[in-house]
């Protein structure tokens, strides 16, 4: 009889509550959350897609170097851009306003670099993917720009807007993965996990019902985050 091999524990190399919630949608709860503190400054003339995958790789490999036990590490980085121009992860209301003005009435792209590492017996196996979604905003009035830039939701978001928030009212067109815009392309994530031997059916049957794991996630963010 073929021996059944249990899933390796999943580690999320991110401090993003949204990514935790996205994984929960597909019934995956990380065993650990280990944010990777890396320099996210773009290199000179670096393009959006290469930046996203470079940062995702950097996060994954840093966390992989910090752990000893066999695990699967999921890391991602999301970059928004108008053409070749990378939009910042807004940290101020003025940056939010700048980003919203840039995308008003135009198509822009959201890239998420995905890097998943299977660490087993000190051997690393990689799966990497860059996913692109195209978004078009309607032409925004000054009133709409000023109103949105006064909200908190664009702060700390790639491109200065939260697509699943009020900004959704501005979208006239989306081509590609919606979960990619939010920070983690779920289709590609599941495909990569499966290719690394992760048994999705085992995870939904067992891991997602572990209340202690859910409590760990909630405690990490200081409030309940999994519904």
UniProtKB/Swiss-Prot annotation:
A GO cellular component annotation in the UniProt record: cytoplasm
GO biological process terms held by the UniProt record: nucleotide metabolic process
Source organism, top-level taxon: Bacteria
Listed cofactors: a divalent metal cation
Listed SUPFAM superfamilies: ITPase-like
Reaction(s) the record says it catalyses: a ribonucleoside 5'-triphosphate + H2O = a ribonucleoside 5'-phosphate + diphosphate + H(+); a 2'-deoxyribonucleoside 5'-triphosphate + H2O = a 2'-deoxyribonucleoside 5'-phosphate + diphosphate + H(+)
Any Pfam family matching the protein: Maf
Gene3D superfamilies listed in its UniProt record: 3.90.950.10
Similarity comment: family membership: Belongs to the Maf family.
Name of this chain's protein: Nucleoside triphosphate pyrophosphatase
């Amino acid at each position: 009889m073929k021996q059944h091999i249990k899933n390796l524990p999943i580690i999320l190399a991110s401090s993003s509550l949204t990514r935790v919630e996205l994984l929960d949608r597909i019934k995956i709860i990380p065993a650990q959350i280990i944010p990777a503190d890396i320099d996210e400054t773009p290199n000179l003339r670096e393009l959006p897609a290469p930046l996203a995958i470079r940062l995702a790789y950097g996060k994954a490999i840093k966390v992989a170097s910090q752990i000893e036990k066999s695990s699967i590490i999921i890391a991602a980085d999301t970059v928004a851009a108008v053409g070749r121009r990378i939009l910042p992860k807004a940290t101020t209301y003025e940056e939010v306003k700048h980003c919203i003005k840039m995308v008003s009435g135009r198509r822009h792209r959201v890239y998420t670099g995905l890097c998943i590492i299977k660490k087993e017996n000190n051997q690393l196996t990689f799966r990497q993917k860059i996913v692109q979604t195209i978004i078009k905003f309607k032409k925004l009035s000054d009133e709409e720009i000023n109103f949105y830039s006064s909200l908190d939701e664009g702060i700390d978001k790639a491109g200065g807007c939260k697509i699943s928030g009020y900004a959704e009212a501005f979208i006239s067109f989306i081509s590609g993965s919606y979960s990619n815009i939010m920070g983690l392309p779920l289709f590609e994530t599941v495909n990569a996990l499966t290719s690394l031997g992760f048994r999705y059916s085992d995870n939904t049957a067992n891991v997602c019902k572990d209340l202690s794991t859910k409590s760990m996630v909630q405690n990490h963010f200081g409030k309940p985050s999994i519904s």
